[in-house]
Structure formats: structure tokens, C-alpha cells
Amino acid sequence: MFLSIMLISYLYGLIFPLLAHYATASNEDVGVSVSRIYFANILGSAAGPLVIGFWLFEITSFDNIMMIITIITMFTTAIAYYIMDSGKRNLSFQKKATYIAIMLILLFSGSNLYKGLYERLFYKTNYTTAKKFSNVIENRSGIISTTSTDGGFADFIYGGGMFDGTFNIYPEKNKNNNNIDRAYKIPTLHENPVELLSIGLSGGAWVRVASLYPDIKKIDVIEINPGYLELIKRYPDVNPILNDQRIQYFTDDGRRWLLRNPDKKYDFILMNTTWHWRNQINNLVSIEFLQLCKLHLKNNGVMYFNATSSPDIPFTATKVFKKVAVYKNFIAVTDGELIQNPETRARNLKKFVINDRPVFNFSNPESKEAFDALVMHSNEDISAHENELHDKYRLYLITDDNLASEFKTGKRIYSPEAAWKKIFAH
């Protein structure tokens, strides 16, 4: 693989100096000729991301784009060869036929040249021709793919090659391959959530669960990649959210939308954040972003988001909110009060309805088990505990600038409290 990369890089590296040599006119100043080549190079480099990245990727697939580029390149090569030396060079019939044949081969074999490319990149050494994505959606915001699962579980979703959830909406253990019980925590945290904001959509399972709670009258969803809406159409468990009149969708960046809508306030903000170590995730878990979200919460409002097991994120949240509670890898934060009464949590959970039937079926042991676990989980405030962990493990306060969430927090080897000088002083 490395040899092939080296060879390709070597061949690409030859292009510019060869152009500078052959395209320099002998009857004019060399500097002028070379400057034109540089200008064309800069123009093409700037136009490439704009035309391909922002336009073509939005209207067609990667393999089609590669075919378009190949055809344009070959036509450009033919034209350049023809006009070189004022058209004095005459191509033989055999050369013309060979060139046309190559173009036709590339044109009709293009769909096979990149067949299974995304699967090869994803599975790497484990790739086989049997491993295929069940859905692939490409646009300028990224690549969304899904894989089918065994055992009756919901399909897995991958955004940019990383796990991004599943389509499961049922909390029972034999179906719950995405820990969707975390979404059912919403009314066990806030006593009366009426208006909800979801930052991120993915496969729609979380928004679908929120829509099953009848007391929620309004749901605003911010999703930067419109491809997820197309994907949701294909899955009946979640596609009812596309026709739910309570739900409004905004294709935008979460932070930008919040800044542009300072008057919007919600009872509940939900954010199923991606892995804390991924590129740019710092912008969704920093103290500045949490402060921005706090401005969009009503009195006693709750923000509930995925810390993905990062110890730095709960600690950062304690510097913005008075109360911080943990459920699995999620944290709930508020300046008000979280529900502490199990009876209230149970009453609210019983309101979840799907297809005119309660979500939690007490005649089903697994459904009853999921219900009981949600009811009995305490919403204990861990703020003081987080401060203790900070002192012990040197947790980081995540800011927009320090990228602390994207790097592992190491355990502090040296502790001043355990220094030899202090020990012998006693």
C-alpha cells in the first residue's frame, strides 16, 4: 500500500515541473509563462473544493464525480495535445483509436472501479465482498451508511465511518442495541417537559422516543447533515417523526443556530453527542457552549447530553450548572431540581404511548425490568464528587480553545499531598 502511495505521489509530483517546462513559450519572457501556470494552478486549487466539494458532492455520488473528473481530464489532455505547437502534431489513426478506446473503457467501467470503496475503507483487513452497506447517502456534509444486523436487532448507523446509533426505539433488553432507555429518562428528569430542543438527529430514534411522550407539544431539531432525513424515510420505526406536526427541522450547525435564535427557550435540551475524542467535538462540550445552551433553558430547564464516558465533561458541566446527575454515559444538568420522587418518575413513564398502546408492557418481563430500572435510578447530584475527582485525577475544564475533550485525561502520577517531604514532616 505504501509503495503504491509513493508511486502515485511521485507521478503527481512530476506534473507541475513538466508543465512548467513544456508550456513555457520560447518567444516570450519565461517569468510570464511560468506565472500563467501558477495562476492556473491556484485557480484550479481554489475551484476544486468549491465545484466538487460544495456542488458536485451535493448532487451526485463519489464514483460519478470521479468519472466526471476523468472524462474532463482526458478531453482536456486531447485538446491541449491538439493545440500544442499550433496543431502541427498529427496523431496517427492507431493513437486516436487507442485514446478513444481508453475513454470508452473508463466511461463504461466507472461504476465498477469504485465498487465497494466505502466498505473497504470501513472494514479494512476484515473486508469481504459479502460485507456491504445496506444504505449509503453522500453529500457535502459527509457520508452516512448503515449495516444490517443479526438476531432481529435494528440496523446500525455510521456517520463519517463512526458509529452513530441505530434505529431501535424499544427499551427492552432483547431489542435495545443502542441504549435507547437513556432517551426514556427525559420525563424522569423534568417533571413537565413541554418544549424540547434536540441538537442532532442521526437516525431519529431519540426524537421518535421524545415524540411518544404526549405532554411534549413542540420539538425543534437541529441537524447539520440533511442526509439523515432521507435515511429516516426508509425506516418505518422512526419515519413517523417526518409527519409529526409538533416537530420542526433546521438544517444548521447547533451553535450557530443557538446564536441566531437568542429568544428561543426550552424546557429540555437533548444532545446525543458523538465520541468526546472526535475532531471538533470540543465545540459541543466546552464551557462556552454549555453557557450558551443555558441561556436557552427556561426556569428549571434541563439539558441532557452524552458525555461518552469522558471524566472531563461532567466536571466542566459543574462549572456552569448547579446540579449534575449521571445516567450511564449521559449527564443531566440544571439550575433547578431534578425529579427525586420515584412515584413521579413512574407516573411520567407510564405516559409513553406508541400506536395507542403503552410503551411499557408490564406483562413483558423485559419491559417491566426496563421500566423499574428507570424508576429506581436516582438523580443524585454529583457536583461535589466531581470536584474531588478533579483534585485526584487532574481533570480538565474544557474550553473552546484547549481541545481537552479530544485528548485522554491521564491519571496524575505526582501528588503534592503524598510528597515525601510532607510524609516525613509528620
Report residues per predicted region.
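Flexible, glycine-/basic-rich loop-and-beta segments that form/coincide
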Residues: 334-376
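Surface-exposed polar/charged interaction patches
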Residues: 351, 355, 377-380, 399, ...
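Short flexible/disordered coil segments
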Residues: 286, 364-371, 390-398
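A cross-taxonomic marker for long C-terminal extensions/tails that follow the last structured domain
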Residues: 375-377, 382-404
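Short amphipathic alpha-helical segments that mediate assembly, nucleic-acid/protein binding
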Residues: 98, 367-368, 382, 390-391, ...
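Alpha-helical transmembrane segments of multi-pass membrane proteins
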Residues: 1-347, 396-426
